[in-house]
Amino acid sequence: MLLVDDDSTDRELFIDAITMIGKNYEIAEAGNGEEAITFLRNTDSLPHLIILDLNMPVKDGRETLKEIKTDPILQAIPVCIMSTSSANFDVQSAYTNGANLFLVKPFEFKELIEMLSSLLSLFSKYVTLPDLAKLEK
């Protein structure tokens, strides 16, 4: 999983919630979209899910989502947008640009655990990501 949010407190909350689920998910973190794209292009193991905040410095979630969903390798990764914005424009734009889910913050901790548990279970069962070794040949 790749967690992209400029707020370190929010990232810690997500990590705590994922830890409470009880499975050993590997979690990579990025503080903005540019860090996320750099990570995705340089990793040997693509995440099964990207959790992406919309409003961040350097490269925001909107730009990052577009870049992910237009990349032939990265586009298969499900992206869950989590934002404090519930504006129809932001929600519609996210889905139009390839987001798989849009959730509005803040969450109650218990709700966050339940949501992440369902998401991770669903995406890990039904998503097959490209084999990077095959793509490089």
Which ranges hold each PLM region?
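Conserved acidic segment of CheY-like receiver
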Residues: 1-18, 34, 50
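Acidic, metal-coordinating helix/loop segments flanking the phosphotransfer/catalytic sites
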Residues: 29-49
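Active-site residues of response regulator receiver
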Residues: 52-53, 83
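Receiver (REC) domain active-site loop signature in two-component systems and cognate sites
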Residues: 56
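A short, hydrophobic beta-strand element within the central beta-sheet of small alpha/beta folds
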Residues: 76-86, 94
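Short, glycine/charged-rich "phosphate-handling" switch motifs in NTP-dependent
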Residues: 100
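C-terminal output helix
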Residues: 107-118, 128-132
